[in-house]
Amino acid sequence: MHHQDRDQDQALAAVLAALLLVGGTLIVRELLGLWPAVAVGMAPALALYGGPPAARRIAVAVEVRRFRRHLAHHDRAAG
């Protein structure tokens, strides 16, 4: 029974999120026009889809830069 309650809660959350997204998009469309509404409507989906890979790439780039600086500092100290 516990799993069924959790599934129902997740379904309710998904429906409410969809309704909020659609409602918010319609309100923005009336206030600002079509293209800002499209941007507002698609931004959360794009952020969820593209956010984690972008964050990983940024984190890897930061660590690579930090490692290269460490190697350069080590080479200067040794040589």
UniProtKB/Swiss-Prot annotation:
Species, as recorded: Streptomyces lividans
Source organism, top-level taxon: Bacteria
Protein's recorded name: Uncharacterized 8.4 kDa protein
Keywords, sorted A to Z: Plasmid
